[in-house]
Swiss-Prot record:
Cellular compartments annotated: Cell membrane
Record's bilayer topology term: Multi-pass membrane protein
Transmembrane parts of this sequence: 16-36, 84-104, 112-132
Classification of source organism: Bacteria, Bacillati, Bacillota, Bacilli, Bacillales
This protein's UniProt keywords: Cell membrane, Membrane, Transmembrane, Transmembrane helix
Annotated Gene Ontology cellular component terms: plasma membrane
Name of the protein in question: Uncharacterized membrane protein YwmF
Length: 159
């Protein structure tokens, strides 16, 4: 049963853990773009820009959505673009495995934060890799990977 005491965990998850998972995800895209010679910028959230630190923009509704934009890649082929699209999921998976290994080896103690973080990261990876179109201008990472590998179509973010 969801009670009043669960509200703190819910707010913690919704306002801290989920945005952290999103930041790691878009950082993965940006890192892969950087590896292949592109310059990425990160937008965390939706709405008006609250704060800009270097290439990172924090928006007013920071806990909903996030995305990475990047320019031309110096190494620009189907494989490099697919790795840029997969970079977010790779970073999420790396953090999932790292946290689990640190807990298994008693470096970290199991607690609610790590449970929620791994849960949200797994959820994020699963839905990012589903090959679906969210709208006419927005596709999942899975669909972007499929289209670039199959047809050579590069996915552009229009925001």
């Amino acid at each position: 049963m969801f009670g009043f005491n669960d509200m703190v965990k819910f707010l913690w998850s919704f306002l801290i853990v989920l945005p952290l998972v999103q930041i790691i995800h878009v950082s993965g895209h940006s890192f892969m773009a950087f590896i292949f010679g592109g310059k990425g910028s990160l937008d965390i959230g939706m709405g008006k820009t609250l704060l800009k630190i270097g290439p990172i923009r924090f928006r007013t509704i920071y806990f909903i959505d996030s995305f990475c934009r990047y320019g031309e890649l110096k190494i620009d082929n189907r494989f490099s673009n697919a790795l840029v699209y997969a970079g977010g999921c790779l970073f999420n998976l790396i953090t999932i495995f790292a946290i689990n290994l640190l807990i298994i080896h008693s470096v970290l103690k199991p607690n609610v934060f790590f449970y929620q973080f791994v849960y949200f990261s797994t959820y994020y990876v699963f839905f990012a890799l589903l090959p679906v179109r969210y709208s006419e201008k927005k596709s999942s990472d899975g669909l972007a990977i499929y289209k670039v590998l199959r047809y050579g179509e590069r996915y552009e973010i229009d925001k």
